[in-house]
Amino acid sequence: MIKDKVSLPVYYEREKWTYSLIIDPLDGMKEFIYRNGRFCINMALVEKGKPVFGMIHNVCDGEILWAFASGEKGMIKNGREEIFPNAGEKSSKLRVAVSRFHITEWELRYVDYLKSLGHEVELVPLGASSKHCMLAKGEVDICPKFGKCSEWDVAAGQVLVEAAGGHVVNAETGGEIRYNKENMISPPFVMFGKRVY
């Protein structure tokens, strides 16, 4: 088991694991400190470097989203099972989810690039993995992350977004993101929602 905020098992042991469970018990520490309602609990099951199950509990909204890499997904809201929304309201704007506290110059440059392609862009500042939940539900369209983050910040969201018809791409290689690596740092990436993928 790999958890944020605790020491990792040494890599020469972890690299032999077929499965690893990656947990972030408090994703969005600043959101928690400022009590703005945008912190989450993330959990992902990784098989041979690929996330196969993801769950995000958006605590203050009383919302739990879960998905399997096979595409099966679900949502629980305030203790009741609900239909997983798969398309937000239609918008002529490209809705880009960015970090409320950690937006980088490269992410702003990416937004400028989208504008240079002729898109009208609406920035949606959000905290923690609530960005990934909104992307999976179709409430935003793109989520770039070019600043530092760890595997436990990304893995669960990747499963949700891809199960909902979106795509996640490693911005350095154009390929997929691998998990349970030696340093556990995620590469820069872009998550695309179903509407734009």
Language-model features and meaning:
Residues G28-M29, V96, L135:
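Buried hydrophobic positions in well-ordered alpha/beta secondary-structure cores of metabolic enzymes
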Residues V10-R14, I56, P85-G88, N180-E182:
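Short secondary-structure boundary/capping segments
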Residues M1-L26, R109-D112, C133, T173-G175:
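N-terminal subdomain of lithium-sensitive/metallo-dependent phosphomonoesterases centered on the IMPase/IPPase/PAP
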Residues I83-E107, Y113-L126:
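Short loop->beta-strand "edge-of-pocket" segments that line small-molecule binding or catalytic clefts
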Residues Y11-G74:
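DPxDG-like acidic metal-binding loop motif
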Residues V46-K50, C60, A69-E72, G79-R80, ...:
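Short loop segments at secondary-structure junctions
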Residues H57, I64-W66, S70-M75, L94-A97, ...:
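Structural helix-boundary/capping segments
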Residues L108-L117, V124, S130-Y197:
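Oxyanion/phosphate-interacting regions
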